[in-house]
Amino acid sequence: MGRPPLPLISVEALTSAALELVDQTGDFSFPKLAKRIGVSQSSIYNHVSGRDEILELLRHRIITEEPYSPVDHQDWEAALRVLIRAYRDAFARHPRLAPLMVLQSITDPDVIGLYEDLALALEAAGFRGRDIVSAISTIDSFALGAALDLAAPEVVWDPPADGYPALKRALSFSGPPSERGDHAFDFGLDVIIAGLRAKLAS
């Protein structure tokens, strides 16, 4: 009687298993990954070089699972709105992945393509060089923060009974918790676009 067949393993299966672990626990490890797929740890290295490659595969997966519409770079404000929303929505579907993504360089061509679209839109607006890099860094921070905000508890600020009157007045008008994140994102997106417009005019 022959040996039982080894479980099939692929890069796609590894990526899916790693994403499931991150969604559930906030991280992944090779022992947990091997156990989930039902293979030995050593067999994983036949398909990926290590943790960094898996992280880039995860980045590729979440950015490409719902592709954004092509943008007209010349209409830079509309283009930025599409791109920033797509970036935020990608991480909003997997908010626990966001902290892991800031730990290494971005190399995936499809993800780099999103940043190329950002750079082209900013260039069309009139920005150059260092200002484009600074604008992209600002957008990056905002989009990742907005995605993490969607994973926040329903009650983010719970001030003590005494004091803090200004915050309490603001919170009384903040609306249902489920709407807070979306409203904050739309507000922040308007602020970023207005700020970029003002920067160009200065």
What do these predicted regions represent?
Residues P67-D110, I139:
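Hydrophobic alpha-helical connector segments
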Residues L33-R36, I44:
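Append "Primarily bacterial transcriptional regulators
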Residues V155-S202:
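C-terminal peripheral helix-coil segments that are non-catalytic and often amphipathic
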Residues M1-K32, V48-E56:
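Basic, helix-initiating cap at the start of DNA-binding domains
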Residues E12-E20, R36, E53-V71, A78, ...:
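Alpha-helical structural segments
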Residues H47-V48, A135:
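Residues in the recognition helix of alpha-helical DNA-binding motifs
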Residues T15, L19-D23, I63, R88, ...:
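Regular secondary-structure segments
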Residues L114-A161, L196-K199:
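Hydrophobic alpha-helical bundle segments that form small-molecule/ligand-binding pockets
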